[in-house]
Amino acid sequence: MSSHDTLLSPVNVGGLQLNNRVVMAPMTRNQSPDNVPTDANVEYYRKRAAGGVGLIVTEGTCVDHIAASGYPNVPYIHGEDRLAGWKRVVDAVHAEGGKIAPQLWHVGGMRKRGVAPEGDVDGYAPSGMNMPGKVNRYTMTTSDIDDVIAAFAKGARDAKAVGFDAVEIHGAHGYLLDQFLWEGTNQRDDGYGGSMAKRGRFVAEIVAACRSEVGSDFPLILRWSQWKQQD
């Protein structure tokens, strides 16, 4: 057996049959005007599937919350036109024999005011910080937390409905979920801050809400990392 045989062999992951173990990681492209996946996005992902990638994880796609986005021209996963755009991407990838999952994204405190189309909306953060010691963002209430959990669950449900094969939840790189996990940016004194278990509660509730929407046999992926862009 060569060193590449295992990498290129098929694998079944929680009922998801992949042609090989090559996974394309998410990469933001900023190529979706009006936050709608376009012909260019369709072709971009189609080519990766045609090249033989076993599983494509899309660029971060923002959930249905007013402060989810922090960058221009990134795709969203809510709204009729945007979901129709993603369906075209999914269909193109499937036509090439590939599998694809969206990365559901909320940037949290990394959002700055002025980013279109939401404009003058603050970044949302567990303790009003985009990095330790700098209180310069909006501090989320428990009602806000509930709204974001619901937005992730809705994104997972809609992703499954348009034909995605799995869903990845972005919990890494200093964005909102990571801001809750990180003691440096989570100084809350309620049920979502303090101990590691409490700091992880928000993430756990998002995963549970998504699971409730997609069912027990649909693959869910949680991405997390030690590295943060604030490092």
What are these regions (language model features)?
Residues M1-V107, V148, A156:
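N-terminal capping/small domains of soluble enzymes
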Residues N73-A101, W182-L220, Q226:
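Alpha-helix-loop-beta-strand connector modules within alpha/beta enzyme cores
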Residues A25, Q103-W105, H170, R223-K228:
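Short beta-strand segments
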Residues N35-V36, I149-A153, D158-K160, Y192-E205, ...:
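Active-site glycine- and acidic-residue-rich loops that bind
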Residues V57-L83, L104-P117, E168-G194:
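Glycine-rich, proline-tolerant flexible connector loops at the mouths of alpha/beta enzymes
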Residues W105-F164:
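Non-globular sequence segments
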Residues P117-M129, G133-T142, L176-A209:
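Active-site-adjacent beta->alpha loops and helix N-cap segments on the catalytic face
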Residues G54, D165, L220:
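Short acidic/polar active-site loop segments enriched in Thr and Asp
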